[in-house]
Amino acid sequence: MQATVPWLSLSILVPIVGALLVPLVPDKGEGKQVRWYALIVTLITFLITVAAYLTGYDPSLSGLQLSERVSWLPDLGLTWAVGADGLSMPLILLTSFITSLACLAAWPVSFKPRLFYFLLLAMDGGQIAVFAVQDMLLFFLAWELELIPVYLLLAIWGGKKRQYAATKFILYTAGSSLFILLAALAMGFFGGGTPSFEYTALAAKDFGTGFQLLCYAGLLIAFGVKLPIVPLHTWLPDAHGEATAPVHMLLAGILLKMGGYALLRFNCELLPAAHSQFAPLLIVLGVVNIIYAALTSFAQRNLKRKIAYSSISHMGFVLIGVGSFSALGTSGAMLQMISHGLIGASLFFLVGATYDRTHTLQLDEMGGIGQKMRIMFALWTVCALASLALPGMSGFVSELMVFAGFATDEAYTLPFRVVICGLAAVGVILTPIYLLSMLREIFFGKEKEELVSHTNLVDAEPREVYIIGCLLVPIIGIGLYPKLMTDSYRSSIEALVSRNLGAMEQVISPTAPLIRGQAPVPAIIQAPAVGAS
């Protein structure tokens, strides 16, 4: 469906052009005018994405909508192609929403404010482009464009070990991005037909199973770094350990979701035959994420690193949902990305706000501040309950959908489903233990004399309450009425799962020796029942 108004191009170009105009904003060096300018640009971008959803997006359709296509370099198959479907539209809205709140969270930044907001706006445009472009080379360019601002935001405004964290981030993410470029070139020039990198053209190509497996493996590494998947995760705790609050919000709220989105868009949608072979591995990796990261989070004494490992654990549910051949499970993975984006952004913002008051991240140095910071304690409590998947919150719905979808997924054998659900439940049990224990150590117990005498323990200010309130509205809204979000992508998810089931039935037919365990594909997969989804 062609767009009558170029909403998506505007949502990409407005923050990028806004970033380029930052040097022209009059300012006396304190950053006040630049702050307001950046906030206005991010709000305009958010309103553009909302207008795109309300005026040009039909949730009942599974195909591409709001599409724009302009030939760029036709001899090389390069095209400016953008569009949105159920996989991308919710994440575009999430990106513009969280970025506008991150801009407000950056209000106290006074060191090099022009450069800071320039990078923030450039990052906004790059991240929206990742979800909106419909050309694999454009996707690679947007993926790389987003890396540079993150690196500089870490290296310049980070903590004591900011150079180490920023360097590790760029080495992991930029190095793994090479696999995206190689896969894009291979898929664009092979498979028959004229060279093209548009998703629709790539989906129509006839790639052999061996070719798909090779591309899938490379893309899994690239996207696994960003998700992140254990053991490709070690950059994330270091990056979160040194980042400032607004950068935290962008890392947890948006950056990790790029990996989950890319798995659905490329590995599942464009390489369905390979996905039927790799899906069990995704399930196992998801369980490893959930349990390993939960146990590691439980042992952390640094507040930022504790929440960072909690994020890794929660993203394990995304892997299980992506690996399932159930519309319910895959829909749960999508909802988990959105839910974690909101909850992760809120928790990391509160970490930054608490550090501004206590000047420490060590739980051993905290305690007894609940009496002096009652509103802050209330905000922490609600966000922690959302993170541990309390009923009535978005996290409960998304995790329940993943569990129910995988448990009823007849594409996998019953023993495998029982084992995976049992192991994943261990992570669900560990989460409230380490989160509630964290709250107790921060706010309860005896006041630390050194903490009270050397810090200004003022309660939450209106700006902070407003930011958390804006994040809690969709968290609670989705928790009470999930259709508010799931209807926006249901049709696209059902079409994706149907395609993957069809590809799996071609690879694993009901009469194939796989069921007897003789085929070179995972014996934990069985042929789905007719009509299973």
From Swiss-Prot:
The chain crosses the membrane at residues 5-25, 36-56, 70-90, 91-111, 115-135, 137-157, 169-189, 210-230, 244-264, 278-298, 315-335, 336-356, 377-397, 418-438, 465-485. It holds the Pfam family Proton_antipo_M. InterPro entries: NADH_Q_OxRdtase_chain4, NADH_Q_OxRdtase_chainM/4, NADH_UbQ_OxRdtase, ND/Mrp_TM. It catalyses: a plastoquinone + NADH + (n+1) H(+)(in) = a plastoquinol + NAD(+) + n H(+)(out); a plastoquinone + NADPH + (n+1) H(+)(in) = a plastoquinol + NADP(+) + n H(+)(out). Its EC number is 7.1.1.-. It comes from the Bacteria. The keyword Transmembrane helix applies. One of its GO terms (biological process) is ATP synthesis coupled electron transport. GO terms for cellular component: plasma membrane-derived thylakoid membrane. The keyword Lyase does not apply. It is a multi-pass membrane protein. Keywords: Membrane, NAD, NADP, Plastoquinone, Quinone, Thylakoid, Translocase, Transmembrane, Transmembrane helix. Disulfide bonds: none annotated. GO terms for molecular function: NADH dehydrogenase (ubiquinone) activity; ubiquinone binding. NDH-1 shuttles electrons from NAD(P)H, via FMN and iron-sulfur (Fe-S) centers, to quinones in the respiratory chain. The immediate electron acceptor for the enzyme in this species is believed to be plastoquinone. Couples the redox reaction to proton translocation (for every two electrons transferred, four hydrogen ions are translocated across the cytoplasmic membrane), and thus conserves the redox energy in a proton gradient. Belongs to the complex I subunit 4 family. This is NAD(P)H-quinone oxidoreductase chain 4.
